[in-house]
Each structure stands twice: as C-alpha cells, then as structure tokens.
C-alpha cells in the first residue's frame, strides 16, 4: 500500500487502490497466517483450528488490528503515532508468510513469562524519526521508513511497565503513543453496542467481553 499510494497521489488518472481485506471473514481459512512450524513448505489454507482467513484489517468481531492504523496513517487520516509489539515467543523462530500475511504484532505489553526476552516493537507514524522508551529509558532513536515506509522497528528486551514512542519531524516532537502492562487486579467488563433491545425476537445486541485492569488496560 505504501508504494501504491505514492503512485495514486502522483498520477491523477489512478483512482485508488484495493486492499484485501478490510474485515476478516470465515472461509479461505488461514490464508493470512504466519507459519512458525512448516518453514520448508507453505500451503494455501491452514488446518483446524483455523476458521477465519486471518487477513483483515479488522477481526471477525470488528476490532481493529494494528495494520489498520498503518493504512490510516498512509491515507493521511491519522496524525497520532501507533505502537504495537510482536509476540516475543516467536522472536527468533524462522517463519513463512503468504501474500496475504500481515504483521502478527498486537497492541499489548502483557507478556507474562517472557521477562528478559528480546521483543520487536513496531511504531507507525508519518514523521522523520521515532524514539522508543521502555519504562522511561530511551532504547533508541531512528529514522522511520528504513525497512518499510511509515514504520520504525525497534529491538528491545521485554519488561513489564510501559513502552512509549515519541516521533519527530525536523527535530521537533509531533506526537507520542504508549501501551501499558495491565495490573493484576483483573476485571471482566461487558460492552453492549446499544442501550436496550425489545424483549422479543425482533432485535439483537452485540456484547463484547474484555479482561483488563481498573485503568482499562486490556490483559
């Protein structure tokens, strides 16, 4: 998308681009998987328990995956940077990706049992540079877009607390974002998409259930 969007903005006769896909779907199970097991071969589909294609900007219940924020930044619709982290359990594992595979990074800093292990942090931003801080200590400051446009990849060591990114343009801070480890006071919360429904069979309510702490940090 990052390369295509440059062409779209440059040439007025290009009307847009097509991304597969916005909302994940049932079927074509696992075409967007990242395979950490069969590194010598890569089939089109994935076996059970895969059910969804796993290539959407949003998952089956409509929650946005990190890649959707990267696209939003490219389109010029988001000014604030966005931080996510790749699962440290697979940091050094060889892997295969399909044409539809997206990053497996998630917006979480909850990796119990992985303390002291290496972890990759992804920072999405429309800026020149990004600086990463873990619990207030600077890890590194680097240019954005060295590997992929609008992204800076940082290597650090996981420790509970918070990871924060500060981005700069022309040396001046233009934004920051962070994710925080949820505390141990886990709470289960339910969020309905509407205030009330009729007591009959004519309507439906979707209720999202989440686990997090008192400050709203998801666990």
Question: Model-predicted segments: where are they?
Answer:
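Substrate-binding clefts and catalytic carboxylate motifs of secreted carbohydrate-active enzymes
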Residues: 1-201, 214-219
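Short, solvent-exposed loop/turn segments enriched in Ser/Thr/Gly
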Residues: 201-207
